[in-house]
Every structure is written in structure tokens, then in C-alpha cells.
């Protein structure tokens, strides 16, 4: 109803930027464009790669901001980090591991990524209702029984949250 959704499963933000954000859909005539990428990069790469994870995060965010700005696109904040007890299917592993870095390290990277984009560009904040009392992504909002993905019924466009939180 007035919008479309293009899910690009298994695509990292880094991979999307290398390919070019404008390559993901026919955007001619699109009035409003929004992107959500980055959780795979936090889960598997930013705490694993050589160098300072925060500097690596900022470099990735700068590339994201540059391409989003060129397209006049909005950026959604990253999902919170779920508890490490979540059993992740092997398709969600990288080099045999469900994640790289501790929960606290990945949360720090995720929070910095969101804050940095908000400071340098703009970001759509929408995930507070997805948190449990420990500040983790609550399993209740994730695909069942085991997945690293948010259940579609909790996507912003399904719930109307995006219109309430846009600045």
C-alpha cells in the first residue's frame, strides 16, 4: 500500500556498499528511500577485522552515509544485540562461529554505529520496544524457533513505528 520492501538476505553493509546502494532496486521515481543494513557486519566482522573496531565502524558508517546522502535516503538504526544463548542455525555462522566479539563489544559497536550516523547524517530510531529488561533484543520478537532475524510482524512498516519515530 504505497510502498515496497526488498529484502536482501545474507548481504552485509560492506557488500551492499561495494555493489552500490542504488543497484538494489529500480529507484527512478521513488519519492522516499530507506535502508537497513549493518547487523551482519556487527555480528561477524567489525569486532574480528584487524584494527580498532570503533574506527572500522566509523569508516563503514561514513561510506553508508555518503551513498545514502547521494540517494536522499533515510537510514534505520541497527537492531539491538540478542543474548548469546540464542541458538543460531549454521547458515547464520561465519567461519564456524555464530558471532565474533563479546556481547558487550558488539553492543558498543552497534551503539556507536547508530550514534555516529545520527550525529553525521540522520537515523530513524525505532527499536526501543524490542528490548528486554537486560537491554538485549528480546527473543520474543525474533523469527521462531531459531533465527538471527527479526520476525516480519515487528518490522517498522508492519507496525507503523517508522512514521512515529521519523525526525
Describe the residue ranges of each PLM region.
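Serine-esterase "nucleophile elbow" of acetyl-processing enzymes
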Residues: 1-30, 118
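Alpha-helical cap/lid subdomain in secreted, periplasmic
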Residues: 21-152, 160-163
Amino acid at each position: 500500500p504505497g510502498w515496497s520492501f526488498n529484502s536482501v538476505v545474507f548481504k552485509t553493509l560492506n557488500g551492499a556498499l561495494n555493489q552500490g546502494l542504488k543497484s538494489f532496486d529500480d529507484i527512478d521515481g521513488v519519492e522516499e528511500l530507506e535502508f537497513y543494513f549493518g547487523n551482519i557486519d556487527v555480528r561477524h566482522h567489525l569486532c574480528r577485522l584487524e584494527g580498532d573496531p570503533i574506527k572500522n565502524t566509523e569508516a563503514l558508517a561514513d561510506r553508508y552515509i555518503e551513498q545514502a546522502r547521494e540517494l536522499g535516503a533515510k537510514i534505520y538504526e541497527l537492531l539491538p544485540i540478542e543474548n548469546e544463548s540464542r541458538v543460531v542455525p549454521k547458515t547464520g555462522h561465519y567461519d564456524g562461529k555464530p558471532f565474533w566479539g563479546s556481547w558487550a563489544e558488539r553492543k558498543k559497536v552497534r551503539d556507536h554505529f547508530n550514534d555516529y550516523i545520527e550525529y553525521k547524517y540522520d537515523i530513524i530510531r525505532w527499536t526501543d520496544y524490542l528490548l528486554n529488561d537486560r537491554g538485549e533484543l528480546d527473543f520474543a520478537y525474533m523469527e521462531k524457533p531459531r533465527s538471527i532475524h527479526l520476525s516480519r510482524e515487528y518490522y517498522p512498516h508492519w507496525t507503523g513505528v517508522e512514521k512515529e519515530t521519523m525526525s
